[in-house]
Amino acid sequence: ATSNGLFNFYLRSKNRVALCAIDECQDWFKTVVGYKSTSSAPSMKRLLQCYDGSHWYENKGNTNKRTGVPSAALALTCFTQPAAFLRMVMPKLVSNSNGLLDRFLLCLPLIKSATISERIEASRKLKETNLTSLDKLYERIYAKHNSSDKVMYSLEEEALDIYVRHNQSNLSSDSSEGNAKNDKNIIRLAAILHVFFNVLEQALDQRVQEISAKISAQTMTAAIALAGYFEKQRAILKQVCIPNSLKLDFS
């Protein structure tokens, strides 16, 4: 996920969203936040712009010819060891106060390893279903949304009402910091959950049909709850990076 790599992807793909997954991402983020002098990774400013799908134009070559795209959006999934990330990267993201951290959905789940007997039982149950892998699901989702035609989803009236009431409740509370970004994240999570569970249900029922264009109230309620979980996780992890705050054991 280098800056040049992303830019060239946008030039080739024309208005498609870049999907990136980075394992052990602490080193990549060290470049983003300025620990390393190399300029291979996108800057924090560029990541902020990619969150909103802003334009990206650059002057290339000796002729300074201006080239680029009107919209460059990035969906980024990162995995890391928490100790290194919280020690080296998180303090930089917190101190910059540029809003980049609030655009990420952060979580540090508790470790839970399944026993051998639990895995055997899960494998047995999986073989009894019509779906033994998520690969086909993701392939269908990709094919559906990687065409030249834009796919539009909207909220059912009840779902919109739930979303508006949640937003108004947040505005009247004392913890309104970052609400605008969290509201965007709720909409994005609602769309993700809507598409995934629609395709999952069809796969389990062994049927293929168009994905509903309307996001339900049930899905919106789930998206609000999930966004709230990520928001609380982010707040806790921010506190860990404040001097003299509670230190957690990640060993």
Segments the model singles out, each with a brief description of its role:
Residues A1-S251:
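Phosphate-handling catalytic cores of nucleic-acid transaction enzymes
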